[in-house]
Swiss-Prot record:
Quaternary structure and interacting proteins, as annotated: Interacts with UvrB in an incision complex.
Disulfide feature: none
GO terms under cellular component: cytoplasm; excinuclease repair complex
Protein's recorded name: UvrABC system protein C
Gene behind this protein: uvrC
UniProt-annotated location(s): Cytoplasm
Length: 593
């Protein structure tokens, strides 16, 4: 069991769901379900197993999981994931062994049937039911409750069920279309969970039968009520409308966004996509950018419908994507969006928890890193990252790790002063020069290693400043990310080369944490600066409102909308003269010309 798995096992939730074991290539080799993900997944890596399971465990290099809200959902999701991914260690379930549905036919005299094949044009379907025995019992229950046609006899010939009071196809009802439509609607209501009327009626009949000592009949009514109770279990993982949908949910925390997409095909949830990245603007804006880029990728099929959370503007998404956009308000569809949001939250929290646990597991990582790079043990590491959006409000940040732990009192922020427009190389040159000129001037302790969040270009710029301009001898490494914004490669040496670094090693986790931390720190500073600049620019030109008063307003109200909502007296309370406060309100509330 590698260190990555050890860390992730400690973070598993006590929830039902599905887990996906992966090999060294990231290929899914086994899909399973669990009532309790923590207990089930841990069991693979503890205790003895049979030969087959031992072989499976020997190939597991990583795992992921999807949280569901019930055991039934986990079971149904497992089937879909197995059919989609065909893992080599799973018993592969064929399509003809799919779960049964209950069907009301569209015939003149409708019938109730159990079927495993869904054809939307010839009836209304309910299910699927993971227990085929339960589906049969439900069908029997419906036969006893609703007098649909139950045989293939011609309409002028009565059948056995007619004499039991369970078939009205041979009575005067047979020519009454309204009767059959009403009966069909009653079943729909019943199978959709609106069964209180029937349950109440059966309860009264049960009590009445018991009062008259008809205990067998009372028991029959009791059994019917219990069968109805079984039917009340509803699934959100599969929908009988057979539509193709993508379901989006997202969660943000600590400057990071996680987006989860559930892919529903033919009414079945078959796969999900998870992506985590730092966000720069308001979360809603960056989500819109993400969803636009998502469907620009030709590998992503555009479905009939896309479900999005409530806080996203549906018209904007529809303009970007070009298909029907739905913000579910209630019921199963809303719960499916909520499930995507829940999984996004869980995934993001797991990322942070892993990083937090990594902090406590850095024993030996620093020494190993020094040995790997052939440098003295890097006790003090200083890392740099730039942040800008199309050149606006460019900033940089430095974080410091001492003995593998962040030393936040040593963190530094930099506003880029000499660079115009988006130029990461020039920005890096300025920041490195400013930082280490100060180190020389003030006699500060230089770091044992400088880490640049970037590739060959940024590292060479930093080396030129350190060695050629300042005459220092400090090792410099670069950390490159992949297209998913994850730590990917370590660059070091002269000339620069990729250093082989096991992804499950402690030194990899240390560098991963450093890169994430400097990125987070830079993004947070950039966002704060942009917000402050936006705030100040809207207040420019108002007579009597100088830098100090703007600062007072910013400190008290935090945002322009809060000032717009404030009363004049609230603004005056901040130390702003009444005439200036009135001018401010007038300026902010006047429509743009």
């Amino acid at each position: 069991m590698n260190e990555l798995i050890k860390h992730k096992l400690e973070l598993l939730p006590d929830s039902p769901g599905c887990y996906l074991h992966k090999d060294k290539n990231g290929t899914i080799i086994y899909v399973g379900k669990a009532k309790n993900l923590k207990n089930r997944v841990k069991s693979y890596f503890h205790g003895s197993h049979n030969t087959k399971t031992e072989l499976l465990v020997s190939e597991i290099e990583d795992f992921e999981y999807i949280v569901t809200t019930s055991n039934t959902e986990a079971l149904l999701l497992e089937i879909n994931l197995i059919q989609e991914n065909m893992p080599k260690y799973n018993i592969r379930l064929k399509d003809d062994k799919s779960y049964p549905y209950i069907k009301i036919t569209n015939e003149r005299y409708p019938r109730l049937m159990i079927t495993r094949q869904v054809k939307k044009s010839d009836g209304t379907y309910f299910g699927p039911y993971p227990d085929s025995g339960a589906a049969t019992e439900i069908k029997r229950l419906l036969d006893r409750l609703f007098p649909f046609k139950k045989c293939t006899n011609p309409a002028n010939k009565v059948c056995f069920y007619y004499h039991l009071g369970q078939c009205n196809a041979h009575t005067v009802c047979q020519t009454n279309k309204a009767y059959w439509d009403s009966l069909r609607e009653d079943v729909k209501q019943f199978l959709n969970g609106k069964d209180n009327k029937i349950v109440n009626g059966l309860t009264e009949k049960m009590k009445s039968a018991a009062m008259t000592m008809e205990f067998e009949r009372a028991a029959e009514y009791r059994d019917l009520i219990e069968a109805i109770s079984l039917l009340r279990t509803k699934q959100r993982v599969i929908h009988q409308d057979m539509k193709d949908r993508d379901v989006f949910g997202y969660f943000v925390d600590k400057g990071w966004m996680c987006v989860q997409v559930f892919f529903v095909r033919n009414g079945k949830l078959i796969q999900r996509d998870v992506n985590m990245f730092p966000y720069y603007n308001e979360p809603e804006e960056d989500f819109l950018t993400y969803i636009g880029q998502f469907y620009q990728d030709t590998k992503h099929f555009l479905p009939k419908e896309v479900f999005i959370p409530q806080d996203i503007d549906a018209k904007s998404v529809e303009t970007i994507v070009g298909c029907k956009i739905v913000k579910p308000q209630r019921g199963e569809k809303k719960q499916l969006v909520n499930l995507a949001i829940k999984n996004a939250r869980v995934s993001l929290q797991q990322k942070f928890d892993l990083l937090e646990k990594d902090i406590r597991k850095t024993h030996g990582a620093i020494e190993n890193l020094g040995n790997l790079l052939n440098i003295p043990k890097p006790v003090r590491i200083e890392a740099f990252d730039n942040s800008n959006i199309q050149g606006t409000s460019p900033v940089a940040a430095m974080v410091v790790f001492v003995n593998g732990k962040p030393s936040k009192k040593d963190y530094r922020k930099f506003k880029i002063k000499t660079v115009i427009g988006p130029d990461d190389y020039a920005s890096m040159r300025e920041v490195i020069h400013r930082r280490y000129s100060r180190v020389l001037k003030d006699g500060l302790t230089p770091p044992d290693l400088i880490v640049i969040d970037g590739g060959q270009g940024q590292v060479n710029i930093a080396r030129d400043v350190i060695e050629n301009q300042l005459g220092l001898a400090i090792p410099i490494a670069g950390l490159q990310k992949n297209d998913k914004h994850q730590t990917h490669e370590l660059l070091f040496g002269d000339p620069l080369e990729v250093v082989e670094l096991p992804r499950n090693s402690e030194e990899f986790f240390l560098l991963h944490r450093i890169q994430d931390e400097v990125h987070r720190f830079a993004i947070t500073f950039h966002r704060q600066l942009r917000s402050k600049n936006s705030f100040s620019s809207k207040l420019d030109g108002i007579t009597g409102l100088g830098p100090k008063r703007k600062q007072l307003l910013m400190k008290h109200f935090k945002s322009l909308p809060n000032i717009q909502k404030a009363e004049i007296e609230d603004i005056i309370m901040c130390g702003i003269p009444r005439t200036v406060a009135e001018s401010l309100r007038d300026s902010l509330n006047d429509p743009p010309k």
